[in-house]
Amino acid sequence: MFPFLKQRSRSVHGEDAPSSTESTVSVAAADIGGACTTLTVWRKSLLVSCEGFTVIDSNGDLIYRVDNYARTRPEELILMDKDGNSLLLMHRTKKITLVDSWGIYEANDTKGETKIPKCPTWYMRKNLKMNILSTKSDILAYVYSGSFDKKNSYIIKGSYRCKSCKIVHVPLNKTVVEIKRKEVRTKGVRFGSDVFDLVVNPGFDTGLAMALVLLLDQMFS
């Protein structure tokens, strides 16, 4: 569908390969195998009247989409599959607060209606120190397993503006997702910052990885 964005998934070799003694570092619908999944993320909706994202796999096929009709500070975002079915819903927890925070809910699409559980599966909070100009920190956000978990499961560090981020599983101190500037192999072709790679390790849900990208975009764009 998108041949100009087609690429091969990068395999895991050497020190990046998951150890057999390590526990699974993800949640739901995890990929199985020894290769990373590399998705191309395009910060553009397929609908003319919307802002959003288009996510493409290594074969150039549409995998995820986000169509946002609210052009300024949306309170809610929905990650959909290629057919427009809701997968994950992200809801801003408070409208007025110093710390930007979101709940991530599993969405069940029933007869065209999206049903949302009462409690979020995941909770993401922007690092408060990022709002203090005198303090430098490479940690962008913290990800918790639910809104009542006091200890974060993941940290996100790096620079979203430069499209250079890592999502690290805290208990294992292991990078499970990377956001990278898209590598160009064809001479004369250059992608802007709105097109980048999302590299997801086996054992981590690609849908959750994309949901975290959406929230980074809300917090740091």
Curated annotation (Swiss-Prot):
Q: Where is this region: Disordered?
A: 1-20
Q: Which SUPFAM superfamilies does the annotation name?
A: Tubby C-terminal domain-like
Q: Which InterPro entries match?
A: LOR, LOR_sf, Tubby-like_C
Please explain the role this protein plays, according to its UniProt record.
Answer: Might be related to the phospholipid scramblase and tubby-like superfamily of membrane tethered transcription factors.
Q: Which family does it belong to?
A: Belongs to the LOR family.
What's this protein's name? Protein LURP-one-related 17
The opening ranks of the lineage are: Eukaryota, Viridiplantae, Streptophyta, Embryophyta, Tracheophyta
